[in-house]
């Protein structure tokens, strides 16, 4: 069986053993407890000029994350092109990685848009 997923060396195949060090356990716990830490250190976005870069959130994006954590129902009334989708997708990624047995759906006005967000 291959050790990578679909030939990507950054992704392990199903059933591969992972060795945990004391440091990696502490980092995992920190990511689990703090979505903002996880997003700023492990989520990457594509920049037009610079390519793949870290997702450095603005204060209003950090406030969005904290609102998602503290409130069950959230409506964000914001203008276009402010990073809402990236912020929400980053939070959802944290949510599905660090919570057991959860379902997540991405809805958009077109199928292509929903797929792009994934």
Model-predicted segments: where are they?
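Phosphate/NTP-binding elements of NTP-utilizing enzymes
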Residues: 2-118
């Amino acid at each position: 069986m291959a050790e990578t997923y679909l030939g990507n060396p950054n992704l392990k195949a199903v059933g591969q053993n992972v060795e945990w060090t004391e440091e990696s356990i502490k980092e995992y716990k920190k990511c689990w407890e703090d979505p903002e830490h996880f997003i700023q250190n492990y989520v990457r976005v594509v920049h037009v000029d610079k390519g793949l870069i870290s997702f450095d959130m603005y204060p209003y994006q950090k406030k969005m994350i904290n609102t998602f954590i503290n409130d069950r129902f959230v409506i964000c009334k914001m203008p276009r092109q402010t990073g809402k989708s990236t912020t929400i997708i980053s939070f959802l990624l944290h949510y599905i990685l660090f919570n057991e047995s959860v379902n997540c759906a991405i809805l958009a006005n077109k199928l292509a848009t929903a797929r792009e967000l994934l």
